[in-house]
């Protein structure tokens, strides 16, 4: 009730009422998405009321508690807003709230013949066979988080980023949105890898795009699985529909591959079409990623209607006004992905 009342008041410019309701909701410490969402929009209400110190305190609380969450990312953007200049975030690392578990294999896992086989295969340079063997053992010993992380690294080494990402999400999901101490050095690289780099780099350069933006879309569309297929027939890393392949393929030099599934799922082909599509959508939406992501999930026509409806308001208003919950989640994830990729790789070679 407080959430609906707070957002309704914000939408009708009843800012004091919005702040009161959202503050009350935060004080109740709701579970799930409500706490970061309420903190974010409370900060907006305070900012619009001109209460700069209260807005900064609220956004800082949000970014400290949920630095990798969608609303935490948005909160950091708000702290950098010129209207909050002089009170912005200092860029320091968020306070640790969680402690990453000790990654120690159980005795039963150490003694398992499958682990010994995986070790021998890895030493022989058979990385995919080693990863498959570790994966099979993990299905039997899913409680062993040391084995889970070892399996994720083995899969990534073998180039199977789809399964590596799945293992990290399934076994260490609580660390993807909340700050934690003593994370393994390569933890975030497993969560946000850069597979098929030459293909993505070439596609990005051909379309004047940031390759990290393409990875943000790819991660949400296919989880890095080049053979991914949706229920409606979208294929590959960027989930390209045959009609899209027919329309864009010839213009990017890959020809009309709409009737050739094996060609469509080829990473270089799929990336070329996906990047061209993303570039066209970015032009259509004046460089804003949120409506581009909405177009990928719900179609260009609906995204255009929703974007027009917010009439020049900031992206955060657009995202939370999307009426389809699936599309809303999809867009939030793409934006969070992009912020995370930039955090990890902005200063590195594409």
Regions flagged by a language model, labelled:
Residues 107-136:
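Alpha-helical segment of the N-proximal tetratricopeptide repeat
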